[in-house]
Amino acid sequence: MNVGLTISFAVGGLLMLSLLTLNNNVMRHSYQFTSDMMEKNQVDNLRQLVSNDMRRIGMGENADLLNFNDNHIRFRARINGQNREISWRLVPGSSVPTNPNLVELRREGPFENDNNAELNFPVRRFEVIAYSDEAGTVQTSDKNQVRSILIEIEVESLQPIGENPDGTPHYASSSWKKLFIPNNMVF
């Protein structure tokens, strides 16, 4: 048996294993980065839609904040010359099969061509907190006292991107929150 040939095969095998490990690590990190960017894009799309809707609260005659709670807000606003209702709410009992942490966030109201539309988004959390002051320090549950509204949204990837140290799946996540002070609600 040739010792040089055996050593060459051993070194070649180790080199091949190290290249495969490197390739695996690059692919895993690429997947994590892509998942993270997708979640950030989803949050950005939700941010734009929610921001556009929140600016309309109290806009027009008979426009009003109809009701709200921790995970729901419904209001009427004047859109293209008509009073229309818009609501954002978590759908109870809904879940996404690939990620048990996600529930369905539903937006109902006019969209694009003025027809009512129902848009659904998988989210981890959607929270509405109303305040009776513009600074967002005094919470209120009375819709007539609302002067500012804090909206918080958290999303996660549909598929796990790895495992936590305890063995549970790890999902890419991104969140956003903003305090809205609708001009038509400030007196």
Q: Each PLM stretch: what is its role?
A:
Residues 2-56:
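Aliphatic-rich helix starts adjacent to a transmembrane/signal segment
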Residues 5, 21-26, 36-37, 61, ...:
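Hydrophobic, well-ordered secondary-structure segments
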Residues 31-32, 38, 54-79:
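Short, glycine/small-hydrophobic-rich surface segments
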Residues 44, 68-69, 145:
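An alpha-helix initiation/capping motif
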Residues 67-138, 170-175:
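Type IV pilin-like appendage domain
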Residues 125-187:
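Short linear sequence signals and composition-biased patches located at protein termini or domain-edge surfaces
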